[in-house]
């Protein structure tokens, strides 16, 4: 459960991401594909090379979903319901992949905003992406 301080930290951190969200989403995906090659199996139709327009496009989708989650931080299950349905019923993504992408996103944010990535902010963002992952996997049951 996100505390009021966590919510403040998440919103402040995401505000600093600003217009770079899509780029960071793509970078996190590239990081995931390189670090965890089995995740590529969900994207057989993608050009997974560095700078690929398909990876950039999906990175923007990831970032947009996170922006939605930040904007509806008190009601993420409702805000992400359609996305949860998509991943559970159509795409059938293994839930462990959300954790892998979450880790890669945190690394990406830490690389781009090292001064802002304090232990407290790191903990808050980790709890946030874990909450998003929980919401996205909630329809698997």
Curated annotation (Swiss-Prot):
| N6-succinyllysine: residues bearing it | 7, 11, 16, 40
Q: How does it assemble?
A: Heterotetramer of two alpha chains and two beta chains.
Q: Which GO terms describe its cellular component?
A: blood microparticle; haptoglobin-hemoglobin complex; hemoglobin complex
- Full protein name: Hemoglobin subunit alpha
Q: Which organism is it from?
A: Cephalopachus bancanus (Western tarsier)
Q: CDD domains, alphabetically?
A: Hb-alpha-like
This protein's encoding gene: HBA
Q: What this chain does, per the record?
A: Involved in oxygen transport from the lung to the various peripheral tissues.
- Please name the GO terms that the record assigns under molecular function: haptoglobin binding; heme binding; iron ion binding; organic acid binding; oxygen binding; oxygen carrier activity; peroxidase activity
Q: In which tissues is it expressed?
A: Red blood cells.
């Amino acid at each position: 459960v996100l505390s009021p301080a966590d919510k403040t930290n998440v919103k402040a951190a995401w505000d600093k991401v600003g217009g770079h969200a899509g780029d960071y989403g793509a970078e996190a995906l590239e990081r995931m594909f390189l670090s965890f090659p089995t995740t590529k199996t969900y994207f057989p139709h993608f050009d997974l090379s560095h700078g690929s327009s398909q990876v950039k496009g999906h990175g923007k989708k990831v970032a947009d979903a996170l922006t939605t989650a930040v904007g509806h931080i008190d009601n993420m299950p409702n805000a992400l319901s359609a996305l949860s349905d998509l991943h559970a019923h159509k795409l059938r993504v293994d839930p462990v992949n959300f954790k892998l992408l979450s880790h890669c996103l945190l690394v990406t944010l830490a690389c781009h905003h090292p001064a802002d990535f304090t232990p407290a902010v790191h903990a808050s963002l980790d709890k946030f992406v874990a909450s998003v992952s929980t919401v996205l996997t909630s329809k698997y049951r």
